[in-house]
A protein has these predicted regions:
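Eukaryotic serine/threonine protein kinase catalytic domain
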Residues: 24-194
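Intrinsically disordered, low-complexity regulatory segments that flank or precede the catalytic domain
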Residues: 1-32
């Protein structure tokens, strides 16, 4: 078994997709058996995201499933640990909330807030482009998130339409914090592709 420290026993109960969130600690650690697994919402380099329902509460989540062997092969262990650590510290209405993490012999799991509107990229592709008021509306939300993160010495480093989700009210939620970083001074690390 490949052992990577990746455990947090907390869940956010989000009944009926209301905007009010209640954070509570579960009496036992999370495991895959706690959830009814639904359809795949998306796939990535070393995992996929599926919609799940927490059996005990009926709450709906997005479960990010990361294959350990691929995380290690692609040298992404530090990014995954960093993502978990940073998301667990974030509390902002435009950032996807991390509810809990767990693992089994093959996978790392991140239980995340399910955002019903899907990827911003899909909406942008469908629209072709947004008018100026809509563009300002979305840009202002990204700026507010960056302002919040920078005030806590975190930087995001992976802004793209695929990492923005739309909630049921049309507001953005930023997701995928694998490249985010805690920076007290300057950083000279480049992210992305050539």
């Amino acid at each position: 078994m490949i052992k990577i420290f990746f455990c947090r026993e907390q869940v956010i109960d989000k009944r009926e997709m209301s905007s009010a969130l209640v954070v509570r600690t579960l009496p036992t650690p999370l495991c895959l058996n706690n959830f009814e697994i639904g359809v795949t919402l998306g796939t990535g380099s070393f995992g996929r995201v599926r919609i799940v329902t927490h059996k005990a509460t009926g709450s709906i989540w997005a479960l990010k499933m990361l294959k350990k062997s691929e995380v290690i092969r692609l040298q992404q262990v530090e990014h995954m640990i960093s993502e978990k650590s940073i998301l667990s510290r974030m509390d902002h209405p435009f950032i996807v909330r991390l509810a809990g993490t767990f693992q089994d012999p093959k996978y790392l799991y991140m239980t995340l807030e399910y955002v019903v509107g899907g990827e911003f990229f899909t909406h942008l592709r469908r629209a072709g482009r947004f008018d100026h008021p809509a563009a300002r509306f979305y840009a202002s939300q990204v700026i507010l998130v960056f302002e919040y993160m920078h005030a806590s010495d975190f930087i995001y480093r992976d802004l793209k339409p695929e990492n923005l989700l739309l909630d049921k009210n049309g507001y953005l939620k930023i997701t995928d914090f694998g490249f985010a970083k805690y920076v007290v001074f300057k950083t000279y690390t480049l992210c992305g592709k050539d």
